[in-house]
Amino acid sequence: MKENEKRALELKIKLDDIFKQYDERTKYILSHPELIEKVNYRKKSDNSLVDKNGIKKPICKDGILLRGKCEYKGDHWTRNSNGHEIVDYLNSLFRVLVATKDSNEEAEETLDTTNLGVEWDIKTETLRSNKSEEICINRTFAKNYISIICIFMLYQSHSENEILEVLADIDKCWSIWNNAPIARINLKKQPGNGSINDSRLSSYISLYGEILQKQIELINPTVIINSAGKPGMNFFKKIYKDLECIDKNYGNGRDKWIYIDKIKKLVIIDIYHFSYRGWGLNDQSLFKELIHRLIYTSMDINKLLM
């Protein structure tokens, strides 16, 4: 076995063990009512960690995305492994981790989601609509997620106009995302209920934070794209103590998007949530803003990571 394959196998075993730790943590939380209260809905009788029958909800699996064949299983899209995703991720120029605050599918209370792999395991996501066997990417979350990955993958080798031309063609965008060796984690750690407020997300992070940190350290990204808002950024600032903003003097100086940790050799891009409709404005102003900020800071990023 080659050295990089050995490293990949060791990493897979450790990442698989992480989800056993998540399950054990959930069992512990469920046995302590004062902890359950932290993530409850507004109604005292509700418990967001169990379903209406009192059965513990599964932890949302996530990590390095699968890059094998996409398949439609009759009522949902899923994805197989090509057998070398972890090797490709470890060998990639930039190890990109996308941090989101919710899964990309929202389940109805009455829907049997047992087989919805994309619901429970983000690694199998295709970003195609589960409502049709047609290859259809029509959700705001998916389009913006794909587009932002494309911007990061292209900004060093393409002009602004060339990137905007790619962004105008969702099929080209999907093709780039489809082959990109990237990882995604869901900071909420529970699937379904596709939106969550900041205070509740912060509660989830406080309950699962120690294991989340272990998972992130194993994935060992060089770039984190934070789409989990303030709770996500606060969490990363606790993990990475030496973060400094490198675009604070860009434009009006009010917004801060790009941070680096010189000790950890890490870049964090703190952007709007992928479901924010402002990303889809006709003038593509927010996409342009991200491109400009990446170009503005490219010397610092290259010096850190190249």
Question: Where are each of the predicted segments found?
Answer:
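Glycine-rich anion-binding loop/nest that anchors nucleotide
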Residues: 100, 222-231
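C-terminal capping/extension of enzyme domains
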Residues: 2-17, 198-213, 233-306
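Short acidic, S/G/P-rich loop/turn micro-motifs used as interaction or catalytic elements
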Residues: 105-106, 191, 231-232, 275-278
